[in-house]
């Protein structure tokens, strides 16, 4: 039996927002397997435990740039929300996004070596670290180059979207980008949803359906129905259009004689765990108290 530590409980709670003792029970049942414990909580607590995908756990900004036939999104991270609002920090993020679009670096290392203001990008970053007093890092970027149209949308500075599309109406591209920011699809179509996400959803659906006590053939239909519902919910073309939920995105595009080729979505801090030392101590104290009861 794996030892369940306070930090493990804290991590699972941060991912799921489930009660601490429920997290401890799930980890115990899963023998310390974090992914399995998260699935157990989803089965037990339903959608409350599905917050992991959208929970923001780090600070920073997303910056965008479109010029000519290329566009880019960049995520620049820092330690606090205060620095994320700093003018110099935001100006650097915009410069980096423009460099990605115009210079087409292959990765963050290549980007960091590009010239900027008489220095390299990394030298400018380090100078900014010294000036501001917080660690700053270029986490990721995406670049589109196309003969089609590009649209970007920034929700504040924490969510960024870029869409490649065709069609005469530029408002369509803007609307789709805004929709992606609001609804956060994981793929363009149901066929493109990653297999591991589908399998994870199927396992959860199977466990929920099995608890219904219904015949096997009914359980199988329940599972298939749950998976199909999931695929529609997370694929862009099948989602109800956020500005008119009587239409799906696919129907809206068809009516506008437009099409979307691909999109990119960045959410600041997605998947990054923020240090929560005080919270871990609180968890440890409550777990210890529970053991004495």
From Swiss-Prot:
PROSITE patterns, alphabetized: EF_TS_2 (PS01127)
Region (Involved in Mg(2+) ion dislocation from EF-Tu): 80-83
Superkingdom of the source species: Bacteria
Molecular functions per Gene Ontology: translation elongation factor activity
A single GO cellular-component term on record: cytoplasm
Keyword Cytoplasm: yes
Keywords carried by this UniProt record: Cytoplasm, Elongation factor, Protein biosynthesis
Subcellular location: Cytoplasm
Main function: Associates with the EF-Tu.GDP complex and induces the exchange of GDP to GTP. It remains bound to the aminoacyl-tRNA.EF-Tu.GTP complex up to the GTP hydrolysis stage on the ribosome.
Protein known as: Elongation factor Ts
Origin species: Burkholderia multivorans (strain ATCC 17616 / 249)
Gene name tied to this protein: tsf
């Amino acid at each position: 039996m794996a030892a369940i530590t306070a930090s493990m409980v804290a991590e699972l709670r941060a991912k799921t927002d489930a009660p601490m003792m429920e997290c401890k029970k799930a980890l115990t049942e899963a023998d310390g397997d974090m992914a399995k414990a998260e699935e157990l909580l989803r089965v037990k607590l339903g959608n409350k435990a599905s917050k992991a995908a959208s929970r923001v756990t780090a600070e920073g900004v997303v910056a965008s740039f479109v010029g000519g036939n290329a566009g880019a999104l960049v995520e620049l991270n820092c330690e606090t929300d205060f620095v994320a609002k700093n003018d110099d920090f935001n100006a650097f993020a915009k410069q980096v996004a423009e460099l990605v679009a115009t210079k087409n670096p292959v990765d963050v290392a290549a980007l960091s070596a590009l010239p900027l203001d008489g220095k390299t990008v990394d030298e400018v970053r380090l100078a900014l670290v010294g000036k501001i007093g917080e660690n700053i890092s270029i986490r990721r970027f995406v670049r589109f180059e196309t003969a089609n149209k590009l649209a970007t949308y920034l929700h504040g500075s924490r969510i960024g979207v870029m869409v490649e599309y065709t069609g005469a109406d530029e408002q369509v591209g803007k609307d789709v980008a805004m929709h992606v920011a609001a609804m956060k699809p994981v793929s363009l179509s149901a066929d493109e949803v990653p297999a591991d996400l589908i399998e994870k959803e199927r396992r959860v659906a199977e466990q929920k359906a099995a608890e219904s006590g219904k015949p096997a053939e009914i359980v199988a239909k329940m599972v298939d129905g749950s998976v199909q519902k999931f695929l529609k919910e997370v694929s862009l073309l099948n989602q109800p259009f956020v500005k008119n939920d009587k239409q799906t995105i696919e129907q809206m595009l068809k009516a506008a004689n437009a099409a979307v080729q691909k999109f990119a979505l960045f959410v600041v801090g997605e998947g990054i765990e923020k240090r929560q030392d005080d919270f871990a101590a609180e968890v440890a104290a409550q777990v210890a108290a529970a053991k004495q009861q």
